[in-house]
Structure formats: structure tokens, C-alpha cells
């Protein structure tokens, strides 16, 4: 996989997200039935030039799903990589979640209760110093982490004001993708070099954050990184306590190799300082 220089790979907007699965029909049903994603067109073969860009041989197929204005594509490759690591937690440096904004956390939680939880004790309301949101983390059948996010009354960001869920959906769309990083300051500088602007940093800690992450003594720096287009955005999670463990380098056909797809000048792949994979499309 290639890494482009900042001049070649300015990240101007998030075009979508790609999840890797070992069972495309099963994962499609989960996102449809649990979260109300809608199928976006027919299943398609992944183009040969994209497979080459990903460093993969053989063939692959893709199903695009939509929630609000955001698109998530589910990829399954003939030659599958590693399953999602069983021993990881929210601080692990391969951790990456999609944050789904909901209007009614109670109804959303009832819908996903059968999924594998990350959080303990159900949805958590974080203190005002951590944004004051209601949040709940869980996993899809392949192990990909997800977060339900409900903004408090009067504090919904402008991008989400006036948004309502379509019939049968619990989600309004995807607010961000969050990635765990070893050094939030270094990652901040790295992503700024690709055109992203940091937002207000918070230090999330306390019992609510501990229950949300199912980790003891949590202290995590949260840094939103905004593309010029606005939402959705990237979020950096720099865990001070506990320190996140690194895993083997991700390959594009590993189930944990979630890719944020960005609009850019030309097709390329980018690995960040911790090995998270980004795909750039022109």
C-alpha cells in the first residue's frame, strides 16, 4: 500500500466508509434490521484497479448501504484476511468505530440490545465537560465497534439540527469515525498536514466514560478533526489510561481494516501513524 505526500493527498471530504466482512449477507441484514440502513443499489464486483490499489489478489464484492446522507459499503473478498481481534478493547490501536446519531436513545438501545455490548450498564450520559451526550458502544456480528450518539437538548450541532429519522430507522446518519491513536498530539499534526482542522479537545474521564468504554481508570483525549466540507468528521482517541496496545499491521482484507473513504485529487491509499487505512478517491 502506498502513502502519499500531503501535496498529493489533501483530505477534503469524507465520501463514505468501507467495512470488511466474512459474511456479506449477514452483515447487510444487521445494518438494515438493527439500524435501519437502506440498500443503495445492487451488489457489485469490486473493480480490478481498486483491488490492486488495496494490494489484494482475486475478486471481491460490495454492497452499499445508506443512512441519511452517509454511505457505508460492506466489502467481502475471495481471499479473506484475519478475523477481528478477540482480545482488543477501546484503547487498542486498531480500534475504530462509526458513530450513529439517533434521535431517541431509548428506542435505539432497545433495538440493538441483542448485539454484543462494549459499554456496561446501557447508554451513558457523559458530563458536560465531555460533551454531555448520551452514548452506547456495541459490536456488529463481525466485531466492528459502533457507537449510538444522542445529543442533549439544545446542544445538537448545527449539522444535525432539523434532522429526523426516516420511517423504520433509528439513525439520522453518521457523525464521525473515531480511531484510537498512540499519541494524540502527533496524530493531530499528521492529519493537519493532510488538510484537516482540529476542533476543541476534551479530556474524557470519570465513571461514565469508564462504563462507556468498559475500561477502568479511563483518561482519553478526544480531538475532532474536521475536513473543509464539515460532517462527517474524523475523531482521534488518545488513551492516556489505559495505554492502547498495537497489533500486527492491518491488511486491506482484514475484518478490522475499516477504511474511511475521502475525496481527494487522485486515487491513493494512506496509512496513518498507527496503521489505520484511508482510501482516497478522485
Features from the language model and the residues they span:
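Short, basic/aromatic recognition patches
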Residues: 119-127
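Short, structured interface segments
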Residues: 74-76, 136-163
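Extended intrinsically disordered, low-complexity coil regions enriched in Ser, Thr, Gly, Ala
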Residues: 29-34, 38-45, 90-94, 104-117, ...
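Core segments of cupin and vicinal oxygen chelate
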Residues: 9, 20-70, 126-131, 137, ...
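N-terminal beta-strand motif that seeds the catalytic metal site of vicinal oxygen chelate
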Residues: 1-28, 34, 41, 95-100, ...
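Vicinal oxygen chelate
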Residues: 13-22, 59-79, 84-112, 134-139, ...
